[in-house]
């Protein structure tokens, strides 16, 4: 029984590692998005895109039997963090251009 518990926990640890790698990849892409938005003169906040994401997450939660509230909370955190990264990236870019 102890071995089974250890095996399950190891799988959970592996999943956690994959989740964090995917978050890092998402963060990196957020910087790319910021650069393109800056070139196009598009604001960081995009309520239409956020609505699309939340609608999509609700649908995916149903498909994968995940509590919708948890899915939405996770993506609220990710979206807010990515917007903060985009703002930081733009500020750094603007400061470099001033020098």
Swiss-Prot record:
It comes from the Archaea. Keywords: Isomerase. Activity is independent of pH in the range of pH 5-9. Its EC number is 5.4.99.5. Pathway: Metabolic intermediate biosynthesis; prephenate biosynthesis; prephenate from chorismate: step 1/1. One of its GO terms (molecular function) is chorismate mutase activity. Thermostable. The midpoint for its thermal unfolding transition (Tm) is 88 degrees Celsius. Substrate binds at residues 26, 37, 46, 50, 86. GO terms for biological process: chorismate metabolic process; salicylic acid biosynthetic process. Residues 1-90 form the Chorismate mutase domain. It catalyses: chorismate = prephenate. Catalyzes the conversion of chorismate into prephenate via a Claisen rearrangement. Homodimer. PANTHER family: CHORISMATE MUTASE. This is Chorismate mutase.
